[in-house]
Regions:
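Conserved nucleotide-sugar phosphate-binding/catalytic loop shared by glycosyltransferases and other
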Residues: 4-12, 29-79, 157, 162-165
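Conserved acidic residues
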Residues: 5, 93-94, 139
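Short, glycine-rich nucleotide/cofactor-binding loops
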Residues: 9-17, 98
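Short amphipathic alpha-helix
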Residues: 17-29
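Catalytic machinery of carbohydrate-active enzymes
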Residues: 30, 85, 141
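Active-site-proximal region of nucleotide-activated glycan assembly enzymes
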Residues: 34, 42, 112-165
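An aromatic- and histidine-rich active-site surface loop
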Residues: 42-46, 95-114
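An amphipathic, basic-hydrophobic alpha-helix
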Residues: 65-95, 105, 113
Length: 165
């Protein structure tokens, strides 16, 4: 029997981000590990979460609406990062896995701040905004396809083709 590990998953509020996170969570839980998921209210309303999945809503701040929107988003991201740091310290995950979308950003920033290993997973053929922003700041990048548009060449050594869960 392997030791129980803790995993923190973070995903945006759409099915494209949440369903792969749910799939990984289900597999990790089936293997006896403890898993927590961070998202926004929208994401946690998407059906399909494993019953044993611990969930947390953190502010993330979607960037839109001109300068005022940018400031509001930055403040929300900052607050979400602080809350995610507390969660990481309490939950003590072996790794933080981000699945893209704005709600994954605070947890990935918190992982970096706490020196917790982090991975992003890109489900699409185009690297999304949050994953593009975090690509140079994470330990590994899991991708679903051989060729990913907007993938930073400087991050090629972090890239691992795994497909979609």
């Amino acid at each position: 029997m392997t030791a129980t590990r803790h995993y923190l998953l973070a995903a945006g509020g759409t099915g494209g981000h949440m369903l792969p996170a749910y799939a990984l969570a289900g597999e990790l839980i089936a293997r006896g590990h403890r898993v927590a998921l961070v998202s926004d209210d929208r994401g946690l309303r998407i059906p399909g979460a494993p019953a044993e999945l611990e969930t947390h809503v953190l502010p993330a701040g979607r960037v839109h609406g001109g300068p005022v929107g940018w400031v509001k988003a930055a403040l929300a991201i900052r607050k979400g990062r602080a809350m995610a740091i507390d969660l990481i310290r309490d939950f003590d995950p072996a790794v933080v896995v981000g699945f893209g979308g704005y709600p994954s950003l605070p947890s990935l920033l918190a992982a970096r701040a706490t020196k917790t290993p982090s991975v992003i997973h890109e489900q699409n053929a185009v690297l999304g905004r949050t994953n593009r922003l975090m690509a140079g700041r994470v330990d590994a990048i899991a991708v679903a396809y051989h060729h990913i548009r907007r993938f930073p060449p400087a991050c090629a050594d972090k890239r691992h083709l795994i497909g979609n869960p």
